[in-house]
Protein backbone atom coordinates (compact mmCIF):
# COMPACT_ATOMS: atom_id res chain seq x y z
CA UNK A 1 0.00 0.00 0.00
CA UNK A 2 1.16 3.52 -0.77
CA UNK A 3 0.24 6.40 1.52
CA UNK A 4 -0.62 9.83 0.12
CA UNK A 5 2.49 11.81 -0.90
CA UNK A 6 4.24 13.32 2.10
CA UNK A 7 5.26 16.93 2.48
CA UNK A 8 8.94 17.29 1.44
CA UNK A 9 11.20 17.14 4.47
CA UNK A 10 8.40 16.00 6.77
CA UNK A 11 9.12 12.62 8.40
CA UNK A 12 6.56 9.88 8.88
CA UNK A 13 6.11 7.95 12.09
CA UNK A 14 4.12 4.74 12.55
CA UNK A 15 2.44 3.68 15.79
CA UNK A 16 1.33 0.04 15.66
CA UNK A 17 -1.94 -0.83 17.39
CA UNK A 18 -2.72 -4.32 18.72
CA UNK A 19 -5.89 -6.08 19.84
CA UNK A 20 -7.21 -5.90 23.38
CA UNK A 21 -6.37 -8.99 25.39
CA UNK A 22 -3.51 -10.11 23.15
CA UNK A 23 -1.38 -12.55 25.16
CA UNK A 24 1.82 -10.97 23.85
CA UNK A 25 0.74 -7.73 25.57
CA UNK A 26 0.01 -9.50 28.84
CA UNK A 27 3.29 -11.43 28.81
CA UNK A 28 5.22 -8.51 27.35
CA UNK A 29 4.37 -6.10 30.16
CA UNK A 30 1.99 -3.87 28.17
CA UNK A 31 -1.53 -2.59 28.87
CA UNK A 32 -4.06 -0.12 27.51
CA UNK A 33 -2.10 2.69 29.18
CA UNK A 34 0.96 1.62 27.19
CA UNK A 35 -0.76 2.62 23.94
CA UNK A 36 -1.70 6.04 25.34
CA UNK A 37 1.92 6.64 26.37
CA UNK A 38 3.13 5.40 23.00
CA UNK A 39 1.08 7.86 20.92
CA UNK A 40 1.99 10.69 23.32
CA UNK A 41 5.69 9.90 22.93
CA UNK A 42 5.43 9.79 19.14
CA UNK A 43 3.75 13.22 19.09
CA UNK A 44 6.23 14.75 21.54
CA UNK A 45 9.38 13.30 19.98
CA UNK A 46 8.34 14.14 16.40
CA UNK A 47 6.57 17.53 16.53
CA UNK A 48 6.93 18.10 12.78
CA UNK A 49 6.12 14.58 11.59
CA UNK A 50 3.05 12.88 10.17
CA UNK A 51 1.88 10.35 12.75
CA UNK A 52 0.12 7.24 11.42
CA UNK A 53 -1.58 4.48 13.40
CA UNK A 54 -1.74 1.00 11.87
CA UNK A 55 -4.96 -0.74 12.92
CA UNK A 56 -4.77 -4.51 13.47
CA UNK A 57 -6.47 -6.69 10.77
CA UNK A 58 -8.69 -8.37 13.39
CA UNK A 59 -10.01 -4.94 14.35
CA UNK A 60 -10.71 -4.09 10.70
CA UNK A 61 -12.68 -7.34 10.30
CA UNK A 62 -14.75 -6.62 13.43
CA UNK A 63 -13.53 -9.68 15.35
CA UNK A 64 -11.55 -7.77 18.02
CA UNK A 65 -11.18 -4.32 19.54
CA UNK A 66 -8.10 -2.15 19.32
CA UNK A 67 -6.74 0.60 21.57
CA UNK A 68 -7.32 3.68 19.42
CA UNK A 69 -10.55 5.37 18.34
CA UNK A 70 -10.54 8.10 15.73
CA UNK A 71 -12.41 10.58 17.92
CA UNK A 72 -9.78 10.28 20.67
CA UNK A 73 -6.84 11.18 18.47
CA UNK A 74 -4.86 14.38 18.05
CA UNK A 75 -5.49 16.22 14.79
CA UNK A 76 -1.95 15.36 13.64
CA UNK A 77 -2.65 11.64 13.87
CA UNK A 78 -4.03 9.66 10.94
CA UNK A 79 -5.71 6.30 11.45
CA UNK A 80 -4.86 3.74 8.78
CA UNK A 81 -8.03 1.65 8.90
CA UNK A 82 -7.55 -0.56 5.85
CA UNK A 83 -5.70 -3.72 4.83
CA UNK A 84 -2.15 -3.24 3.63
CA UNK A 85 1.12 -5.11 3.30
CA UNK A 86 3.11 -4.43 6.50
CA UNK A 87 6.48 -4.38 4.74
CA UNK A 88 5.26 -1.93 2.09
CA UNK A 89 3.87 0.32 4.82
CA UNK A 90 6.98 0.13 6.99
CA UNK A 91 9.19 1.01 4.02
CA UNK A 92 7.47 4.42 3.91
CA UNK A 93 8.16 5.22 7.58
CA UNK A 94 11.05 6.97 9.32
CA UNK A 95 10.39 5.69 12.85
CA UNK A 96 8.20 2.92 14.28
CA UNK A 97 6.65 2.66 17.75
CA UNK A 98 5.37 -0.68 19.05
CA UNK A 99 4.29 -2.38 22.24
CA UNK A 100 5.05 -6.02 21.38
CA UNK A 101 3.93 -6.28 17.73
CA UNK A 102 5.86 -8.47 15.29
CA UNK A 103 5.84 -5.46 12.96
CA UNK A 104 8.59 -4.06 15.15
CA UNK A 105 10.96 -6.81 14.04
CA UNK A 106 9.88 -6.40 10.41
CA UNK A 107 10.77 -2.71 10.77
CA UNK A 108 14.22 -3.72 12.05
CA UNK A 109 14.68 -5.92 8.98
CA UNK A 110 14.07 -2.81 6.89
CA UNK A 111 16.59 -0.81 8.90
CA UNK A 112 14.03 1.43 10.63
CA UNK A 113 14.48 2.89 14.15
CA UNK A 114 12.12 1.05 16.52
CA UNK A 115 10.96 2.12 19.97
CA UNK A 116 9.51 -0.66 22.15
CA UNK A 117 7.08 0.13 24.96
CA UNK A 118 6.69 -3.56 25.81
CA UNK A 119 9.10 -6.47 26.02
CA UNK A 120 8.86 -8.41 22.74
CA UNK A 121 11.33 -11.18 21.90
CA UNK A 122 13.46 -8.88 19.74
CA UNK A 123 13.90 -6.21 22.47
CA UNK A 124 16.91 -6.11 24.77
CA UNK A 125 19.49 -7.11 22.17
CA UNK A 126 20.74 -3.58 21.43
CA UNK A 127 18.69 -3.12 18.25
CA UNK A 128 15.68 -1.27 19.68
CA UNK A 129 15.11 1.77 21.87
CA UNK A 130 13.51 0.11 24.91
CA UNK A 131 11.52 2.33 27.30
CA UNK A 132 9.76 -0.31 29.41
CA UNK A 133 10.64 -0.10 33.15
CA UNK A 134 11.99 -3.68 32.99
CA UNK A 135 14.07 -3.07 29.85
CA UNK A 136 17.40 -2.77 31.69
CA UNK A 137 16.81 -6.02 33.57
CA UNK A 138 15.85 -7.73 30.29
CA UNK A 139 19.04 -6.53 28.58
CA UNK A 140 21.07 -7.82 31.51
CA UNK A 141 19.46 -11.25 31.17
CA UNK A 142 20.07 -11.28 27.42
CA UNK A 143 23.75 -10.86 28.24
CA UNK A 144 24.98 -9.75 24.82
CA UNK A 145 24.08 -7.72 21.77
CA UNK A 146 22.91 -9.29 18.53
CA UNK A 147 22.39 -8.06 14.97
CA UNK A 148 19.24 -8.46 12.89
CA UNK A 149 20.59 -11.49 11.02
CA UNK A 150 21.30 -13.27 14.32
CA UNK A 151 17.74 -12.67 15.49
CA UNK A 152 16.25 -13.72 12.17
CA UNK A 153 18.18 -17.00 12.05
CA UNK A 154 17.33 -17.83 15.65
CA UNK A 155 13.61 -17.00 15.43
CA UNK A 156 12.69 -17.91 11.85
CA UNK A 157 15.01 -20.85 11.13
CA UNK A 158 16.24 -22.47 14.37
CA UNK A 159 13.25 -21.90 16.66
CA UNK A 160 10.27 -22.30 14.34
CA UNK A 161 9.08 -25.54 12.75
CA UNK A 162 7.40 -25.55 9.34
CA UNK A 163 4.91 -27.79 7.56
CA UNK A 164 5.03 -28.02 3.76
CA UNK A 165 1.72 -26.54 2.49
CA UNK A 166 1.49 -29.18 -0.26
CA UNK A 167 2.77 -32.41 1.28
CA UNK A 168 1.93 -31.81 4.94
CA UNK A 169 5.44 -33.02 5.81
CA UNK A 170 8.16 -31.26 7.76
CA UNK A 171 9.70 -28.50 5.64
CA UNK A 172 12.10 -25.58 5.71
CA UNK A 173 11.26 -21.91 5.80
CA UNK A 174 12.37 -21.71 2.17
CA UNK A 175 9.73 -24.26 1.10
CA UNK A 176 7.05 -22.18 2.81
CA UNK A 177 8.34 -18.89 1.40
CA UNK A 178 8.37 -20.35 -2.12
CA UNK A 179 4.74 -21.46 -1.73
CA UNK A 180 3.64 -18.12 -0.28
CA UNK A 181 5.48 -16.11 -2.95
CA UNK A 182 4.01 -18.22 -5.76
CA UNK A 183 0.45 -17.91 -4.48
CA UNK A 184 0.80 -14.21 -3.75
CA UNK A 185 2.12 -13.53 -7.26
CA UNK A 186 -0.68 -15.49 -8.94
CA UNK A 187 -3.25 -13.84 -6.67
CA UNK A 188 -2.03 -10.38 -7.63
CA UNK A 189 -2.19 -11.25 -11.35
CA UNK A 190 -5.91 -11.87 -11.44
CA UNK A 191 -7.98 -10.10 -8.81
CA UNK A 192 -10.37 -8.54 -11.34
CA UNK A 193 -13.84 -10.04 -11.93
CA UNK A 194 -13.46 -12.77 -14.56
CA UNK A 195 -15.86 -14.17 -17.16
CA UNK A 196 -15.24 -17.68 -18.52
CA UNK A 197 -16.78 -17.58 -21.98
CA UNK A 198 -17.97 -20.47 -24.13
CA UNK A 199 -16.63 -23.31 -22.01
CA UNK A 200 -18.29 -26.68 -21.52
CA UNK A 201 -19.30 -27.83 -18.05
CA UNK A 202 -16.21 -30.00 -17.78
CA UNK A 203 -13.90 -27.31 -19.05
CA UNK A 204 -15.26 -24.78 -16.55
CA UNK A 205 -14.80 -27.26 -13.72
CA UNK A 206 -11.15 -27.76 -14.63
CA UNK A 207 -10.37 -24.12 -15.39
CA UNK A 208 -11.86 -22.34 -12.38
CA UNK A 209 -9.40 -23.67 -9.77
CA UNK A 210 -6.56 -22.17 -11.83
CA UNK A 211 -8.04 -18.67 -11.81
CA UNK A 212 -7.34 -16.40 -8.85
CA UNK A 213 -10.14 -13.87 -9.36
CA UNK A 214 -12.42 -13.05 -6.44
CA UNK A 215 -15.46 -13.31 -8.72
CA UNK A 216 -15.70 -15.86 -11.57
CA UNK A 217 -18.77 -16.16 -13.77
CA UNK A 218 -19.55 -18.35 -16.77
CA UNK A 219 -21.16 -17.12 -19.98
CA UNK A 220 -22.23 -19.22 -22.92
CA UNK A 221 -21.80 -16.18 -25.22
CA UNK A 222 -20.58 -12.62 -24.84
CA UNK A 223 -22.12 -10.31 -27.41
CA UNK A 224 -20.32 -7.20 -28.68
CA UNK A 225 -22.97 -5.08 -26.96
CA UNK A 226 -22.50 -6.74 -23.58
CA UNK A 227 -18.72 -6.63 -24.01
CA UNK A 228 -18.87 -2.87 -24.56
CA UNK A 229 -20.68 -2.42 -21.23
CA UNK A 230 -18.28 -4.43 -19.07
CA UNK A 231 -16.14 -2.47 -16.57
CA UNK A 232 -12.62 -1.71 -17.70
CA UNK A 233 -11.04 -3.95 -15.06
CA UNK A 234 -12.91 -7.05 -16.30
CA UNK A 235 -10.94 -10.14 -17.33
CA UNK A 236 -12.13 -12.54 -20.05
CA UNK A 237 -11.00 -16.19 -19.87
CA UNK A 238 -11.09 -18.22 -23.11
CA UNK A 239 -10.01 -21.78 -23.82
CA UNK A 240 -7.20 -21.80 -26.36
CA UNK A 241 -7.72 -19.83 -29.55
CA UNK A 242 -11.50 -20.12 -29.68
CA UNK A 243 -13.65 -17.01 -30.14
CA UNK A 244 -10.98 -15.09 -32.07
CA UNK A 245 -13.38 -12.22 -32.76
CA UNK A 246 -14.21 -11.82 -29.08
CA UNK A 247 -10.52 -11.94 -28.15
CA UNK A 248 -9.71 -9.19 -30.67
CA UNK A 249 -12.62 -6.97 -29.56
CA UNK A 250 -11.83 -7.39 -25.86
CA UNK A 251 -8.15 -6.58 -26.30
CA UNK A 252 -9.03 -3.60 -28.48
CA UNK A 253 -11.08 -2.32 -25.52
CA UNK A 254 -8.08 -2.75 -23.26
CA UNK A 255 -9.56 -5.68 -21.32
CA UNK A 256 -7.32 -8.49 -20.10
CA UNK A 257 -7.89 -11.72 -22.03
CA UNK A 258 -6.51 -14.94 -20.57
CA UNK A 259 -6.07 -17.74 -23.10
CA UNK A 260 -5.88 -21.05 -21.29
CA UNK A 261 -4.40 -24.35 -22.39
CA UNK A 262 -3.16 -27.60 -20.89
CA UNK A 263 0.23 -27.44 -19.23
CA UNK A 264 3.13 -29.59 -20.36
CA UNK A 265 2.95 -32.02 -17.42
CA UNK A 266 -0.80 -32.41 -17.47
CA UNK A 267 -2.27 -35.43 -15.71
CA UNK A 268 -2.34 -39.15 -15.06
CA UNK A 269 -4.64 -39.76 -18.01
CA UNK A 270 -6.20 -38.15 -21.07
CA UNK A 271 -8.13 -34.91 -21.02
CA UNK A 272 -10.61 -36.47 -23.43
CA UNK A 273 -11.24 -39.14 -20.76
CA UNK A 274 -12.04 -36.26 -18.36
CA UNK A 275 -8.94 -36.55 -16.22
CA UNK A 276 -8.60 -33.16 -14.55
CA UNK A 277 -5.39 -31.26 -15.35
CA UNK A 278 -2.68 -30.75 -12.79
CA UNK A 279 -1.31 -27.80 -14.76
CA UNK A 280 -2.67 -25.12 -17.07
CA UNK A 281 -1.06 -22.32 -19.02
CA UNK A 282 -2.82 -19.01 -18.32
CA UNK A 283 -1.50 -16.61 -20.93
CA UNK A 284 -2.50 -12.92 -21.23
CA UNK A 285 -0.69 -12.49 -24.55
CA UNK A 286 -1.72 -15.44 -26.71
CA UNK A 287 -1.29 -19.20 -26.93
CA UNK A 288 2.10 -20.86 -27.07
CA UNK A 289 1.29 -22.97 -30.16
CA UNK A 290 0.28 -20.06 -32.41
CA UNK A 291 3.39 -18.45 -33.94
CA UNK A 292 1.43 -15.52 -35.39
CA UNK A 293 1.94 -13.62 -32.13
CA UNK A 294 4.39 -13.83 -29.25
CA UNK A 295 2.80 -15.61 -26.30
CA UNK A 296 3.91 -14.95 -22.74
CA UNK A 297 5.98 -18.13 -22.98
CA UNK A 298 7.80 -16.95 -26.09
CA UNK A 299 8.47 -13.60 -24.44
CA UNK A 300 9.89 -15.32 -21.36
CA UNK A 301 12.09 -17.55 -23.51
CA UNK A 302 13.28 -14.51 -25.46
CA UNK A 303 14.05 -12.19 -22.55
CA UNK A 304 14.11 -13.88 -19.14
CA UNK A 305 17.54 -13.97 -17.56
CA UNK A 306 18.21 -17.51 -16.33
CA UNK A 307 20.85 -17.50 -13.61
CA UNK A 308 22.91 -20.56 -12.62
CA UNK A 309 20.51 -21.47 -9.80
CA UNK A 310 17.57 -21.37 -12.23
CA UNK A 311 19.42 -23.52 -14.75
CA UNK A 312 20.35 -25.94 -11.98
CA UNK A 313 16.69 -26.25 -11.07
CA UNK A 314 15.90 -26.95 -14.72
CA UNK A 315 18.58 -29.65 -14.84
CA UNK A 316 17.33 -31.36 -11.66
CA UNK A 317 13.75 -31.26 -12.93
CA UNK A 318 14.78 -32.70 -16.29
CA UNK A 319 16.65 -35.54 -14.61
CA UNK A 320 13.67 -36.29 -12.35
CA UNK A 321 11.24 -36.37 -15.28
CA UNK A 322 13.44 -38.77 -17.23
CA UNK A 323 14.26 -40.97 -14.25
CA UNK A 324 10.56 -41.43 -13.41
CA UNK A 325 9.32 -41.63 -16.99
CA UNK A 326 6.98 -38.65 -16.55
CA UNK A 327 5.41 -37.09 -19.65
CA UNK A 328 2.25 -35.14 -20.47
CA UNK A 329 -0.36 -37.88 -19.97
CA UNK A 330 1.65 -40.65 -18.27
CA UNK A 331 -0.05 -43.46 -20.17
CA UNK A 332 0.92 -46.76 -21.71
CA UNK A 333 3.18 -49.62 -20.75
CA UNK A 334 6.77 -48.81 -19.88
CA UNK A 335 8.04 -52.00 -21.52
CA UNK A 336 10.37 -51.05 -24.37
CA UNK A 337 9.03 -52.32 -27.72
CA UNK A 338 11.13 -54.88 -29.56
CA UNK A 339 12.83 -53.90 -32.80
CA UNK A 340 12.82 -56.57 -35.51
CA UNK A 341 16.06 -57.84 -37.00
CA UNK A 342 15.57 -55.69 -40.12
CA UNK A 343 16.06 -52.54 -38.02
CA UNK A 344 19.55 -53.47 -36.85
CA UNK A 345 22.22 -51.10 -38.09
CA UNK A 346 19.69 -48.54 -39.32
CA UNK A 347 19.00 -45.06 -37.99
CA UNK A 348 15.82 -45.28 -35.89
CA UNK A 349 13.37 -42.42 -36.44
CA UNK A 350 10.26 -42.05 -34.30
CA UNK A 351 7.42 -40.11 -35.97
CA UNK A 352 4.84 -38.75 -33.55
CA UNK A 353 1.25 -38.39 -34.71
CA UNK A 354 -1.13 -35.78 -33.34
CA UNK A 355 -4.84 -35.08 -33.10
CA UNK A 356 -5.35 -33.58 -36.54
CA UNK A 357 -8.00 -31.01 -35.63
CA UNK A 358 -5.97 -29.84 -32.63
CA UNK A 359 -5.40 -26.09 -32.53
CA UNK A 360 -1.63 -26.53 -32.33
CA UNK A 361 -1.68 -28.38 -35.68
CA UNK A 362 -4.03 -25.85 -37.30
CA UNK A 363 -2.03 -22.84 -36.18
CA UNK A 364 1.50 -24.10 -35.80
CA UNK A 365 1.97 -26.51 -38.69
CA UNK A 366 0.99 -24.74 -41.88
CA UNK A 367 3.63 -26.39 -44.10
CA UNK A 368 3.13 -30.03 -43.13
CA UNK A 369 -0.55 -30.54 -42.41
CA UNK A 370 -1.60 -33.79 -40.83
CA UNK A 371 -0.09 -37.11 -39.80
CA UNK A 372 -0.04 -38.58 -43.31
CA UNK A 373 1.94 -35.58 -44.58
CA UNK A 374 4.35 -35.74 -41.62
CA UNK A 375 5.08 -39.41 -42.17
CA UNK A 376 5.51 -38.85 -45.91
CA UNK A 377 7.92 -35.94 -45.38
CA UNK A 378 9.97 -37.96 -42.92
CA UNK A 379 10.18 -41.00 -45.19
CA UNK A 380 11.03 -38.85 -48.22
CA UNK A 381 13.98 -37.27 -46.39
CA UNK A 382 15.12 -40.54 -44.81
CA UNK A 383 14.56 -43.38 -47.30
CA UNK A 384 17.01 -45.78 -45.63
CA UNK A 385 16.04 -45.20 -41.98
CA UNK A 386 13.89 -47.48 -39.84
CA UNK A 387 10.77 -45.36 -39.31
CA UNK A 388 8.49 -46.04 -36.36
CA UNK A 389 5.11 -44.32 -36.18
CA UNK A 390 3.30 -43.69 -32.89
CA UNK A 391 -0.15 -42.13 -32.95
CA UNK A 392 -1.58 -39.77 -30.33
CA UNK A 393 -3.12 -41.44 -27.23
CA UNK A 394 -6.44 -39.64 -27.86
CA UNK A 395 -6.52 -41.15 -31.36
CA UNK A 396 -5.61 -44.60 -30.05
CA UNK A 397 -8.42 -44.29 -27.48
CA UNK A 398 -10.92 -43.45 -30.21
CA UNK A 399 -11.67 -40.03 -28.72
CA UNK A 400 -10.22 -37.81 -31.49
CA UNK A 401 -9.41 -37.89 -35.20
CA UNK A 402 -5.95 -38.51 -36.66
CA UNK A 403 -5.66 -42.12 -37.85
CA UNK A 404 -3.32 -42.79 -40.75
CA UNK A 405 -4.78 -43.63 -44.13
CA UNK A 406 -4.01 -47.20 -45.26
CA UNK A 407 -1.83 -45.83 -48.07
CA UNK A 408 0.30 -43.99 -45.52
CA UNK A 409 0.76 -46.90 -43.16
CA UNK A 410 3.11 -48.60 -45.60
CA UNK A 411 5.52 -45.66 -45.25
CA UNK A 412 6.25 -46.74 -41.68
CA UNK A 413 8.42 -49.77 -41.01
CA UNK A 414 6.76 -50.24 -37.64
CA UNK A 415 3.61 -48.86 -36.00
CA UNK A 416 3.54 -48.90 -32.20
CA UNK A 417 0.46 -48.65 -30.00
CA UNK A 418 0.02 -49.20 -26.26
CA UNK A 419 3.63 -48.50 -25.28
CA UNK A 420 4.39 -45.30 -23.40
CA UNK A 421 6.11 -42.42 -25.11
CA UNK A 422 9.11 -42.80 -22.81
CA UNK A 423 9.52 -46.44 -23.82
CA UNK A 424 9.40 -45.51 -27.51
CA UNK A 425 11.91 -42.71 -27.06
CA UNK A 426 14.46 -45.17 -25.71
CA UNK A 427 14.59 -46.76 -29.18
CA UNK A 428 14.88 -43.58 -31.22
CA UNK A 429 17.91 -41.80 -32.62
CA UNK A 430 15.71 -39.00 -33.96
CA UNK A 431 12.17 -37.81 -33.32
CA UNK A 432 10.12 -36.05 -36.03
CA UNK A 433 7.06 -33.97 -35.08
CA UNK A 434 4.76 -31.25 -36.31
CA UNK A 435 4.12 -29.41 -33.02
CA UNK A 436 3.79 -32.32 -30.57
CA UNK A 437 4.97 -31.92 -27.00
CA UNK A 438 6.64 -35.28 -27.54
CA UNK A 439 9.44 -33.38 -29.27
CA UNK A 440 10.11 -31.49 -26.05
CA UNK A 441 10.06 -34.75 -24.10
CA UNK A 442 12.53 -36.17 -26.62
CA UNK A 443 14.85 -33.21 -26.02
CA UNK A 444 14.74 -33.96 -22.29
CA UNK A 445 16.05 -37.43 -23.11
CA UNK A 446 18.88 -36.19 -25.32
CA UNK A 447 17.30 -37.09 -28.67
CA UNK A 448 17.72 -35.20 -31.96
CA UNK A 449 14.39 -33.54 -32.79
CA UNK A 450 13.08 -32.35 -36.18
CA UNK A 451 10.18 -29.88 -36.11
CA UNK A 452 7.95 -29.37 -39.15
CA UNK A 453 5.80 -26.83 -37.30
CA UNK A 454 6.31 -24.16 -34.65
CA UNK A 455 6.07 -25.66 -31.16
CA UNK A 456 7.23 -23.50 -28.26
CA UNK A 457 10.56 -25.36 -27.99
CA UNK A 458 11.57 -24.84 -31.65
CA UNK A 459 13.71 -21.97 -32.86
CA UNK A 460 16.06 -21.72 -29.87
CA UNK A 461 18.96 -23.71 -31.31
CA UNK A 462 17.98 -27.06 -29.80
CA UNK A 463 15.98 -28.53 -32.72
CA UNK A 464 16.31 -28.96 -36.48
CA UNK A 465 13.61 -26.63 -37.75
CA UNK A 466 11.84 -27.12 -41.08
CA UNK A 467 9.52 -24.18 -40.38
CA UNK A 468 10.79 -20.57 -40.41
CA UNK A 469 10.81 -18.86 -36.99
CA UNK A 470 12.61 -15.53 -37.57
CA UNK A 471 11.30 -13.94 -34.36
CA UNK A 472 13.18 -16.43 -32.18
CA UNK A 473 16.80 -15.32 -32.27
CA UNK A 474 18.01 -16.25 -28.80
CA UNK A 475 20.06 -19.42 -28.25
CA UNK A 476 19.10 -21.38 -25.14
CA UNK A 477 20.51 -24.35 -23.32
CA UNK A 478 18.17 -27.24 -22.64
CA UNK A 479 18.14 -26.53 -18.91
CA UNK A 480 17.23 -22.88 -19.55
CA UNK A 481 14.36 -24.01 -21.77
CA UNK A 482 13.14 -26.46 -19.12
CA UNK A 483 13.28 -23.86 -16.35
CA UNK A 484 11.24 -21.27 -18.25
CA UNK A 485 8.75 -23.66 -19.88
CA UNK A 486 8.04 -25.85 -16.85
CA UNK A 487 8.97 -23.85 -13.75
CA UNK A 488 7.84 -20.34 -14.72
CA UNK A 489 5.08 -20.57 -17.31
CA UNK A 490 2.25 -22.92 -16.23
CA UNK A 491 0.25 -22.94 -13.02
CA UNK A 492 0.11 -26.16 -11.01
CA UNK A 493 -2.43 -27.62 -8.58
CA UNK A 494 -2.87 -31.00 -6.90
CA UNK A 495 -6.21 -32.66 -6.06
CA UNK A 496 -7.44 -31.81 -2.58
CA UNK A 497 -4.54 -29.44 -1.87
CA UNK A 498 -5.03 -25.75 -1.18
CA UNK A 499 -3.27 -23.21 -3.39
CA UNK A 500 -0.87 -23.40 -6.30
CA UNK A 501 2.10 -25.74 -6.03
CA UNK A 502 5.38 -26.15 -7.90
CA UNK A 503 6.08 -28.34 -10.90
CA UNK A 504 8.29 -30.47 -8.66
CA UNK A 505 5.29 -31.15 -6.39
CA UNK A 506 3.27 -32.35 -9.39
CA UNK A 507 6.10 -34.51 -10.72
CA UNK A 508 6.55 -36.12 -7.31
CA UNK A 509 2.78 -36.79 -7.09
CA UNK A 510 2.74 -38.34 -10.57
CA UNK A 511 5.80 -40.47 -9.82
CA UNK A 512 4.13 -41.87 -6.70
CA UNK A 513 0.95 -42.59 -8.68
CA UNK A 514 2.96 -44.25 -11.41
CA UNK A 515 4.78 -46.51 -8.94
CA UNK A 516 1.46 -47.45 -7.33
CA UNK A 517 0.02 -48.42 -10.73
CA UNK A 518 2.84 -50.79 -11.67
CA UNK A 519 1.30 -54.13 -12.60
CA UNK A 520 -2.23 -52.73 -12.83
CA UNK A 521 -4.30 -53.70 -15.86
CA UNK A 522 -5.55 -51.17 -18.40
CA UNK A 523 -9.05 -49.78 -17.96
CA UNK A 524 -11.76 -51.26 -20.12
CA UNK A 525 -13.87 -49.02 -22.36
CA UNK A 526 -16.85 -49.48 -20.01
CA UNK A 527 -14.86 -48.49 -16.93
CA UNK A 528 -13.54 -45.40 -18.72
CA UNK A 529 -17.05 -44.31 -19.69
CA UNK A 530 -18.32 -44.81 -16.15
CA UNK A 531 -15.50 -42.72 -14.71
CA UNK A 532 -16.07 -40.00 -17.31
CA UNK A 533 -19.77 -39.90 -16.39
CA UNK A 534 -18.85 -39.47 -12.73
CA UNK A 535 -16.49 -36.59 -13.49
CA UNK A 536 -19.13 -34.92 -15.64
CA UNK A 537 -21.86 -35.29 -13.00
CA UNK A 538 -19.67 -33.58 -10.40
CA UNK A 539 -18.98 -30.77 -12.87
CA UNK A 540 -22.71 -30.21 -13.42
CA UNK A 541 -23.31 -29.99 -9.68
CA UNK A 542 -20.44 -27.56 -9.09
CA UNK A 543 -20.50 -25.39 -12.21
CA UNK A 544 -23.74 -26.16 -14.01
CA UNK A 545 -25.15 -22.67 -14.39
CA UNK A 546 -24.37 -19.88 -16.83
CA UNK A 547 -25.04 -16.29 -15.76
Tell me what each language-model feature is.
Residues 1-9, 26, 128-198, 202, ...:
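Leloir-type glycosyltransferase catalytic cores
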Residues 1-3, 7, 30-31, 208-275, ...:
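Segments forming glycine/polar-rich beta-alpha architectures that bind adenosine-containing cofactors
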Residues 39-81, 375-417:
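Catalytic donor nucleotide-activated moiety binding site of glycosyltransferases and closely related
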Residues 77-83, 135, 218-222, 413-418, ...:
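Short acidic-hydrophobic, aromatic-tinged amphipathic segments that line or gate anion-handling sites
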Amino acid sequence: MHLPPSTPGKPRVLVVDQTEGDLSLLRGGASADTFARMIAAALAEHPDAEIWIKTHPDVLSGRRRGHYERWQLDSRVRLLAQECCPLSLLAQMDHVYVATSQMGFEALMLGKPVTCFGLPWYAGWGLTHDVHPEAARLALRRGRQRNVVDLFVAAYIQYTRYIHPVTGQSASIFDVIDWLARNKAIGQEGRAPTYCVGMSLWKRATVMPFLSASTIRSLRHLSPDKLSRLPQDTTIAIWGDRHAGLIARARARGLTVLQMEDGFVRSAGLGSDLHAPLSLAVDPDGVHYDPKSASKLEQLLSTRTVNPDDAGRGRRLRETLVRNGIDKYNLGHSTIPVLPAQALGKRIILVIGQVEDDASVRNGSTLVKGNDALLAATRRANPDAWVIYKSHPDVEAGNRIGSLKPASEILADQIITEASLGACLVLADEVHVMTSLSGFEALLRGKAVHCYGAPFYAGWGLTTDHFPLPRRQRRLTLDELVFVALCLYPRYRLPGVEGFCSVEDVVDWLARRKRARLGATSESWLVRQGRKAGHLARSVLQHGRYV
